[in-house]
């Protein structure tokens, strides 16, 4: 009798264990939390957003400042940010983030309400309306001007405005003749001004100015070391989906534009479709982009060490996939 009771008890325990094991196995993983900016920085994620809402919680923000504290406190697992913010976050988090990939190269352009500017040299004696003082737009503009023999605020006057929308409005109204604008603001301004020209691609000018030793890199993606260490396979799967999403956007601009408008990354599909070709949306792994990033960060550091957090990031800053 005792033997039979023992067998029944063991069977019951095994059944209970199986139920608990089954419950554990079926429990869904917590969504990976991602932050992105509206505009080109977030455009490459749109297909991933559309197809994988069950795996990723992706929130769009208007300003990088809204993202910084969330990364520092660990409230989010990853973020698409301006490139110079990545090493700043590396310092702020005490090296608890890694740069996984570059998301956008240059999206900056000189636009003119007219046709007097054909080259950087033609900017001498002119006034440029711009936004982004203290950030990559300022450092990029100053670097390119200096490399072409022009001294900012001496040979070329720069009027710094609060945001890109203000610069766009000034050019559209005729208040400003020349502006420094990123996509999609180039496209939206062009829609308002029939005579608007886009004579200078700052990405090309950066390459010329640096002798090809670095690249104008505007956006990067970072992830916390916590999510990398605890869910590396999921991180790698996310990055694969991210790369596929970028490929989709570049190869299917019309369909991607509809999704970009649907998810609120840009206000309209028409603007998105026109902006995609000039937005330089890419997925370049940290390993493949390392040399270009180091060259870019060196230029920023030489201009103002605070622009990258004071010091050049070390080797551990770059995610290798290992």
PLM regions and their residue ranges:
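Short, surface-exposed acidic
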Residues: 152-156, 264-275, 307-314
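Conserved C-terminal helix/tail region of periplasmic/extracytoplasmic solute-binding proteins
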Residues: 294-322
